[in-house]
C-alpha cells in the first residue's frame, strides 16, 4: 500500500517480520564512530566467494548519520537495531544454496563485522 501511494521506501519496507535474520553478529565499532569514519569504512558482499558489491560509506547517496537522523523522526532507533540502507551497485538475484557473506571493513582491510548465510 505504501509503495502504491509513493511514500518513502523505508516506510514501505519496514514493518514487523519484514526481514528474517539469523544469528546476531558483533560489530567492534560504535555507530557514532562510523559517523566520523565514513571515508575509512567500506561494505562488501560476496556470493559464493565472488565479490558482487563493494564500496565505501563516503559514496552513499545519504550518509549513515543522516539516515539515522531521518528515521529517528518517525521511528525509534535503538542499539542493536538493523537498518537496511540500500546497497552499492551490483544488486542481483540469489538462489537456493548460495553462500552470502556481508562485511563492514576498515580501509586497511580489517573486518569490523561480518555476516554469513546460506540461502534456503
Map each language-model feature to its residues:
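Catalytic-core "active-site belt" of small-molecule-metabolizing enzymes
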Residues: 1-82, 90-120
Amino acid at each position: 500500500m505504501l509503495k502504491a501511494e509513493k511514500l518513502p521506501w523505508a516506510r514501505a519496507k519496514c514493518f514487523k517480520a519484514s526481514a528474517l535474520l539469523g544469528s546476531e553478529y558483533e560489530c567492534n565499532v560504535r555507530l557514532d564512530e562510523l559517523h566520523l569514519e565514513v571515508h575509512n569504512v567500506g561494505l562488501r558482499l560476496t556470493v559464493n566467494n565472488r565479490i558482487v558489491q563493494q564500496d565505501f560509506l563516503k559514496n552513499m547517496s545519504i550518509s549513515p548519520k543522516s539516515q539515522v537522523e531521518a528515521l529517528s523522526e518517525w521511528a525509534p532507533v535503538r542499539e542493536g537495531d538493523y537498518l537496511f540502507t540500500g546497497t552499492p551497485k551490483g544488486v542481483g538475484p540469489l538462489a537456493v544454496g548460495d553462500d552470502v557473506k556481508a562485511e563492514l571493513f576498515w580501509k586497511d582491510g580489517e573486518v569490523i563485522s561480518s555476516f554469513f548465510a546460506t540461502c534456503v
